[in-house]
Amino acid sequence: GSKVPNFELKDFRAQKVKSRKFFNSNKPTLFVVAAEWCPDCHEELPAVQKFYDENKDRVNVVVVFISNRSSLLDARKFVESNKYTFPVFYDFDKSIVNGFKVKGVPFNLKIRKSVIEDISEGTMTLDGLNEMFMD
């Protein structure tokens, strides 16, 4: 696996957060790149919420909303209206889209200690997410 690029995100209060904060723990991270206008994301995110509820003790979950055709406010409204409780961030400077070469959303990564172990492009189910993090 290749190493994760360093980047900054904004949380939904528009505060900047450095990527190191996510990946340095001993837990693996499910890193999902999404957009609130994306129908496949609408399909996947309920599964991500369920996965988060069931696994948050052993897996970090991070969902990043991209800034293409979107705004922090749009993303925040979408998350609030769906009552999602997983940690959410905003790719304000496109560093995620560029750094991970994201061609489409949803884009799912399994990251452990800053190394990318698995990538899955397209919609994932709860079963698929559980399989990705079996070990």
Predicted regions and their residues:
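A short beta-strand-turn-helix
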Residues: E8-T29
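Short pre-active-site segment immediately N-terminal to redox-active cysteine/selenocysteine motifs
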Residues: N26-T29, A34-W37, G104
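Hydrophobic beta-strand anchors of alpha/beta hydrolase catalytic cores
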Residues: L30-F31, V61, N108
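Cofactor-binding loop segments of dinucleotide-utilizing enzymes, especially the Rossmann-like FAD-
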Residues: V33-A35, V64-I66, K113
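Conserved redox-active cysteine motifs that mediate thiol-disulfide chemistry
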Residues: V33-K50
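Solvent-exposed loop/turn segments at secondary-structure junctions
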Residues: A35-D40, S67-S70, K94-I96, T123
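Conserved segment of the thioredoxin-like fold in thiol-based oxidoreductases
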Residues: E54-F92, V105
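Thiol/disulfide oxidoreductase modules built on the thioredoxin-like
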Residues: K77-Y84, F92-M134
